[in-house]
UniProtKB/Swiss-Prot annotation:
It is an enzyme of class 2 (transferase). It comes from Desulfitobacterium hafniense (strain Y51). Pfam families: HTS (PF04204). Belongs to the MetA family. The lineage of its organism: Bacteria, Bacillati, Bacillota, Clostridia, Eubacteriales. This is Homoserine O-acetyltransferase.
Length: 307
């Protein structure tokens, strides 16, 4: 089934060429079904790249999804033109009276800053609080996961001695959780971050459960009981060449950076990267959409406030 996006969105053209079923607003208006309503709070600098990555995964589900793109109004983007944001994105004030089946809060390359020093932190706190009564299930990614764990549960983040950078093996802590249905015993996920959340802090919070982790990259999936909030510390949505682009960028700026682990054959950056996370990423997003959004959300979204 298609994902419904704003008319003219550049990601639509890219994904259509990949044979992902995209439906623009005009055509979607004539569909006599209620699609899932998903709002994506995009905190990444390059909005087009991130929205394309996430829409690609949402479009691989048999469910029809209606997309609303959201950006923090209190932050001035240096990488995405304001005209683009005005044309394709909404502000919180414009959607705060609506209710959504699901929400995705992306990462942001600001994890070395204290949360309180991030210019849009007060707005993000307001949005996260709003999501509790107006969104059925929220998926937090990387820095977004750290922000959510800190805001709701006081879980701190810690600086790493070196950037966690590469594709790492993960295992499951539970096998009877629907979010994890179909996952391999060992699966791979890209990570790209300078900070971490720690297991010893999370296990102190009774509302939280660690669902998956890695000996190398630490905690990966954390969920609240019932799946209303899912925290993902890695980047399963990454394209095959995203880590390469980050590595090449840092090398060009002469920044200290290690070769991403388990990514290039023989750890040789001249080789073509090996993708080992595509199956996991599609399953993670499909399971979240199906089991935690579609199967659980009330048909009448106005009932959300009572749950």
């Amino acid at each position: 089934m298609p994902i419904n996006v704003p008319d003219g969105l550049p990601a639509a053209e890219i994904l259509t060429k990949e044979d992902v079923f995209i439906m623009e607003e005009k055509r979607a208006e004539h569909q006599d079904i209620r699609p899932l309503s998903i709002v994506i709070l995009n905190l990444m600098p390059n909005k087009i790249i991130t929205e394309t990555q996430i829409l690609r995964l949402l479009g691989n589900s048999p469910l029809q999804v209606d997309i609303t793109l959201l950006y923090p109004e209190t932050h001035r983007s240096k990488n995405t033109p304001e005209e683009y944001l005005i044309k394709y994105y909404q502000t919180f004030d414009s959607i705060k009276d609506q209710k959504f089946d699901g929400m995705i809060i992306t990462g942001a390359p600001i994890e070395q800053m204290p949360f309180e020093e991030v210019d849009f932190w007060p707005e993000l706190q307001k949005i996260m609080d709003w999501s509790k009564a107006n969104v059925f299930s929220t998926l937090f990614i990387c820095w977004g996961a750290q922000a959510g764990l800190y805001h709701f549960f006081g879980v701190p983040k810690y600086p790493l001695p070196a950037k966690m950078f590469g594709v790492f093996p993960h295992t499951l802590n539970r096998r009877d959780i629907r979010l994890l249905r179909g996952f391999d015993d060992i699966f791979y996920v890209p990570h790209s971050r300078h900070t971490e959340v720690r297991k010893e802090d999370i296990v102190k919070v009774p509302e939280l459960e660690i669902l998956s982790e890695s000996e190398e990259s630490g905690v990966y999936l954390v969920g609240t009981k019932g799946g209303r909030q899912i925290f993902v510390t890695g980047h399963s949505e990454y394209d095959p060449y995203t880590l390469k682009a980050e590595y090449d960028r840092d090398i060009s700026y002469e920044l200290p950076i290690n070769i991403p682990q388990n990514y290039y054959p023989g750890d040789d950056p001249r080789q073509t990267p090996v993708v080992r996370w595509r199956g996991h990423s599609n399953l993670l997003f499909a399971n979240w959409l199906n089991y935690y959004v579609y199967q659980e959300t009330p048909y009448n979204l106005e009932e959300l406030g009572n749950r």
